[in-house]
Design a protein with these regions (language model features):
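Arg/Lys-rich, positively charged N-terminal/basic patches that mediate binding to nucleic acids
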Residues: 1-39
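Compact soluble domain cores
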Residues: 39-49
Length: 107
């Protein structure tokens, strides 16, 4: 099985920290924050082994850029896949019910 390098951008790392911190501090649910962190890390690990199982999103603004979404809990890891160089680039970690296409139009 082919292994892929996973690069997490600063924006994605900041998103993940903000999500975990919000759940822990604002919602006062440390256990849920720990579960979400574990799910996030599991998702990153799955991208190392089989990123192709997540298809390119059909949402406007994402499809054109080849952005794929890997769900975990109520969130999505937005990433691109470079098969030729066996590289996954994690762009953002966002609430799944947010207007994802609008967030990527701004970038």
């Amino acid at each position: 099985m082919r292994n892929y390098s996973v690069i997490v951008t600063k924006a994605a790392a900041d998103d993940a920290v903000e999500i975990i911190r919000y759940i822990s501090d604002n919602l006062k649910n440390r256990k849920a924050a720990e579960r979400h962190l574990e799910l996030y890390l599991d998702t990153l690990n799955s991208l190392k082994e089989m990123p192709g199982i997540y298809g390119i999103s059909t949402m406007e603004g994402l499809y054109e850029r080849g952005i794929r979404l890997a769900p975990f809990g109520n969130f999505d890891v937005a990433f691109t896949l470079d098969e030729q160089n066996a590289t996954v680039t994690v762009l953002r970690v966002l609430y799944a019910m947010s207007d994802l296409s609008n967030k990527f139009k701004k970038q």
